[in-house]
A protein has these predicted regions:
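Nucleic-acid-processing active sites and adjacent nucleic-acid-binding tracks
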Residues: 58-93, 224
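Acidic beta-strand-to-loop metal/phosphate-binding motif
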Residues: 26, 91-101
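Conserved catalytic alpha/beta cores of large enzymes that bind or transform nucleotide phosphates
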Residues: 363
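Conserved "right-hand" nucleotidyltransferase catalytic core of DNA-directed polymerases
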Residues: 1-68, 113, 130, 141-143, ...
């Protein structure tokens, strides 16, 4: 990373003395997670790293950097040992998006036996219609304040990097105040949520959700084993089946609505139209039609989709050392989930895997 011509001023420095904390602490991590948006958290693939840990309680907050590319780091082993001791002495550990931080802490050998509290899950119980469960939005609601990001953004501009996705490249002096504030806000917000959870008679449900969070993180890290050799064999078999079906239709593009409409009309079939007069060759059209040629087109499309989405993408491309590591979501959140309280999954969505057809069973 090239040093800027004009270096922004920063007064923050890593702590020299590591303080004692109370038995209720908030923790927030800063990470290098290059494939987060595309594939979910990197802790399940080990393709990123933690660069610093922030801790806060009612009296104080600190940031402990140990992996910033730009420097200002503490000894990593010292930080991990200290954080482990803080957690062991705590009666509860607070997070904003606990599943993310718990997974990364696990890669450092940091385990939490105390109750885990996630303020975003708490807010989903309090207000299932909330526009956003981000830390910044919750700070606006409960604290009438927001995260202070200007210093971080100025430094990122000076070093010509992305303020959020690449902050790990900055010297820690430009990240420290921002990271500390994330932990500080998390702790403060939860103190406001506690009476609301009790007033709405949600405490028992809330405690159940808290117990579930570490279990789901463990499920993600454990993953589901897949047989890659059989997946390769199934991929070849389905490719051949699809090819055999497609040869019957010449140059017909089986994904083109205009071509499918014309082909179907040449067979004497009536094709539904939209209000604007465009052909509507939907799934319902294929299911309702009993013409053998149309059925073969539908079969070719189904095989293509199942093969590409589930065999090639999910099993062959998204596996890590022979396992699929999906993310599990307890509630609605800014990154997905449901408002009904039903568990959902993503990266990949395991609930979409077909199981009724012969191909689905093979998958």
């Amino acid at each position: 990373m090239q040093q800027p011509l004009f270096v922004p001023k920063a007064t923050w420095r890593p702590p020299v003395i590591l303080p004692s904390f109370s038995d209720s602490v908030a923790i927030d991590l800063e990470t290098c997670d290059p494939n987060l948006k595309r594939s979910g958290p990197g802790y399940k693939r080990r393709d990123g790293k933690v660069v610093g840990i922030a801790i806060a309680d009612e009296h104080q907050h600190i940031y402990l950097p140990f992996g910033h590319l730009g420097g200002d780091n503490l000894d990593k082993n010292l930080v991990i040992s200290y954080v482990n001791n803080v957690i062991k002495e705590s009666k509860e550990v607070l997070f904003a998006n606990a599943s993310y931080d718990l997974g990364w802490l696990e890669t450092l050998g940091v385990t939490i036996s105390s109750p885990v509290r996630d303020i975003q899950i708490a807010e989903a119980l309090i207000d299932e219609e909330c526009f956003s469960y981000s830390l910044n939005n919750l700070a606006k609601k409960y604290l009438k304040s927001t995260k202070q990001e200007q210093g971080l953004r100025d430094a990122a501009d000076a070093f010509d990097i992305d303020a959020k996705g690449e902050m790990w490249k900055l010297p820690a002096r430009y990240v420290g105040e921002y990271a500390e504030m994330d932990a500080r806000l998390t702790w403060d917000i939860y103190q406001h949520q506690i009476p609301v959870l009790k007033e709405q008679d949600l405490w028992n449900i809330w405690e159940l959700e808290c117990k579930l969070t570490p279990v789901l993180v463990h499920m993600t890290m454990q993953g589901v084993p897949v047989d890659l050799d059989k997946a390769e064999q199934l991929n070849k078999k389905l490719k051949q089946q699809e090819s055999n079906l497609r040869t019957q239709f010449g140059d017909l593009d089986i994904w083109s609505p205009p071509q499918l409409a014309k082909y179907s009309e040449n067979l004497g079939l009536k094709v539904p139209r939209t209000e604007k007069g465009n052909p509507s060759v939907s799934k319902e059209f294929f299911i309702a039609c009993d013409h053998p040629k149309v059925k073969q087109i539908y079969d070719a499309r189904s095989i293509n989709r199942l093969r590409k989405v589930f065999v090639e993408d999910i099993i062959l491309h998204q596996n890590y050392k022979g396992r699929i590591h999906a993310d599990f979501k307890q509630t609605a959140s800014d990154s997905g989930g449901t408002r009904s309280g039903r568990l959902s999954s993503a990266n990949p969505n395991m609930q979409q895997v077909p199981k009724r057809s012969d191909i689905g069973k093979a998958i």
